[in-house]
Every structure is written in structure tokens, then in C-alpha cells.
Amino acid sequence: MSDESNPPKVILLVEDSKADSRLVQEVLKTSTIDHELIILRDGLAAMAFLQQQGEYENSPRPNLILLDLNLPKKDGREVLAEIKQNPDLKRIPVVVLTTSHNEDDVIASYELHVNCYLTKSRNLKDLFKMVQGIESFWLETVTLPAA
């Protein structure tokens, strides 16, 4: 339960893998942090949501974005670039959560001002711990700008 002085944290997960998004959802279900998880499956939907366009015109502003790089319709790299170039969106922390170990992807993401780049573990237990770490750091430890 939240009140107006302490609204739930809004987490936007942009992930086309249903298995990976289910895992993030399961980890966050165990959370003591009041939150709302919104899952979108492609980059076009993510940008429409963030820019409050079309069916997303009343969407909440996320406190944190978890972004896969390899997305349909609009690549995660393009989404990241658009977020960080938009004055209304650029302060929202973006964590890239991807399977890519490619050094060029890491460098390109940081050049686009990603806040954190994490490579998904193939081991479910390790991936579970990684998502718990994201939650702990980004939703409990740091001070985020108001949504």
C-alpha cells in the first residue's frame, strides 16, 4: 500500500523475452518495496509509453527503466539514445539488462549515457540475484528524482 507522500516506484521493463520478464516479475514479487512493474515487449511501445502517446497518454513516468538491447520494432540502443536526448526523460535511470557480452555494445551504451550495463546470466540463480541487486541498489539505496 502506498500513500500520496510515498507513491509506489514505477519500473518499466522493456524485454521481448517472456521468460526473462517473468523472472524479473517473480523477483520483484518478493520485494518489500511498493512498486508497479510495467512490461513492454518492443522499443516502439517503450517510446510511446515514455512519451505518453496513443494508448499510453496517461502512463505514469517510470522511476527506473530496465532495457534489453535486442528488441523488435526499435532496437534498445535506439531507445536508449532517444531517452537520453529527451530533456523530459534523460534523468530517468536506465539499466541495460541484456545477453550481449559484446564490448562494442558496452561502450556504445555508456557513450549513450546508460546508468548501468548488466549482462544476463544464463544461470537462473545468478540472474535472480542480479535482479535483486538492481532492486536493492536502484530502489532502496540511491535517491532518484521524482517521477
Swiss-Prot record:
Sorted alphabetically, which SMART domains does this protein's record hold? REC
Which UniProt keywords are given for this protein, alphabetically ordered? Phosphoprotein, Two-component regulatory system
Which one GO biological process term can you cite for this protein? phosphorelay signal transduction system
Keyword ATP-binding found: no
Q: Positions modified as 4-aspartylphosphate?
A: D68
User: InterPro entries under this entry?
Assistant: CheY-like_superfamily, Sig_transdc_resp-reg_receiver, TCS_response_regulator
Query: Is Phosphoprotein one of the keywords?
Result: yes
Q: Which PROSITE patterns match?
A: RESPONSE_REGULATORY
PTM:
Phosphorylated by Cph1.
Where are the annotated coiled coils located? none
Q: Which is an annotated Pfam family here? A: Response_reg
Ranges of residues in domain Response regulatory: 10-135
Explain the purpose of this protein.
Answer: Forms a two-component system with Cph1 in which it acts as receiver substrate.
Cross-referenced PANTHER family? RESPONSE REGULATOR RCP1, RESPONSE REGULATOR RCP1-RELATED
Please state what the protein is called: Response regulator Rcp1
This protein's species is Synechocystis sp. (strain ATCC 27184 / PCC 6803 / Kazusa)
